Structures are given as structure tokens and as C-alpha cells.
């Protein structure tokens, strides 16, 4: 399985970079995983609704440019479906079973994802009803993907 994590914004925090590097190393035994960082759209504070839409649309274009037609896209969004780790593992396993060898997880910038990215997504996933920093979501997502592979192989880790 080829997994891409496409996210808006450059990661600056060293501790997050270290955690991400660790999970990428662990995941290399199970899948080809790449993290694609795309620049965020520079925007002043106190944007109007129309300006927010423009920012999301510009970031959305960058995201969509990185997704091929045969990729199964999972948008990370607060309004997405919440799953347990076991349910998430089953859904990843099903994708592999049904020949979906390319999977992209999409993480928007601080304003979220554009409507075009949401339309292109095959599903939407939420890790919590709480708002989490989009930089932190990369690490949380990689940990859950790793956990899913361990669960699916019956390997210890997930308890």
C-alpha cells in the first residue's frame, strides 16, 4: 500500500518532526508512506468569510494537484466520521483487500479544507470533536496508521 499524507503548512516543531520520523521508520515495514508538506496561504488576521474561502480554495488547489485519479482520498475534518482504532484498522484493511493501493490522507491548514477537496474525498475522518492543531494531526495520524497495521497483523501494540 502507498500512503500519502498531504498537509498544508511547514512543520517547525522539532519534537513533532522527531515523532513523525519515528513513525515513518516504523511504518516502512508495512507500507510506503510519504508526507507531502504544501505551503500555506499567507493571510492576515481577521479575515472575512469571503477571504477565508479564497484562502481555502488556493490551498485546496495545491492539495488536489498532488492527488492522482486512482487515489482513495480520506479528508481529516472535524465533521468527519469518528472511528475506534480497531474500526480504522478494518477500513484500511478493506481498502487493501479491494485493490486500493494508493491512499491519501489530507490535512488542511488552520482554516480547514476547501469544498473542492471535500468533494474529491472518498471519505471524511475525524479523530475528535475537539479542534486539534493541524501540525499535531500528522503525528496522531501516523501513530494510528501504524497501530492499524499492527492490529491487522495481530501484532502486539494496540492494547
Curated annotation (Swiss-Prot):
Subcellular localization: Cytoplasm
GO molecular function: rRNA (pseudouridine-N3-)-methyltransferase activity
Catalytic activity: pseudouridine(1915) in 23S rRNA + S-adenosyl-L-methionine = N(3)-methylpseudouridine(1915) in 23S rRNA + S-adenosyl-L-homocysteine + H(+)
EC number: 2.1.1.177
UniProt cross-references to Gene3D superfamilies, sorted A to Z: 3.40.1280.10
Location (main, coarse): cytoplasm
Family: Belongs to the RNA methyltransferase RlmH family.
Protein name: Ribosomal RNA large subunit methyltransferase H
Amino acid at each position: 500500500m502507498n500512503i500519502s499524507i498531504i498537509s498544508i503548512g511547514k512543520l517547525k516543531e522539532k519534537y513533532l518532526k522527531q515523532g513523525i520520523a519515528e513513525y515513518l521508520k516504523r511504518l516502512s515495514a508495512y507500507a510506503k508512506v510519504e508526507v507531502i508538506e504544501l505551503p500555506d496561504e499567507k493571510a492576515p488576521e481577521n479575515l472575512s468569510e469571503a477571504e477565508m474561502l479564497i484562502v481555502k480554495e488556493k490551498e485546496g488547489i495545491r492539495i488536489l494537484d498532488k492527488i492522482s485519479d486512482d487515489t482513495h482520498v480520506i479528508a481529516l475534518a472535524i465533521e468527519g466520521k469518528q472511528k475506534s482504532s480497531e474500526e480504522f484498522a478494518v477500513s484500511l484493511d478493506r481498502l487493501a483487500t479491494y485493490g486500493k493501493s494508493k491512499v491519501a490522507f489530507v490535512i488542511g491548514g488552520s482554516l480547514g479544507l476547501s469544498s473542492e477537496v471535500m468533494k474529491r474525498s472518498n471519505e471524511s475522518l475525524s479523530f475528535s470533536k475537539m479542534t486539534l492543531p493541524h501540525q499535531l494531526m500528522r503525528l496522531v495520524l501516523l501513530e494510528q496508521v501504524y497501530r492499524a497495521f499492527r492490529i491487522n497483523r495481530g501484532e502486539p501494540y494496540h492494547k
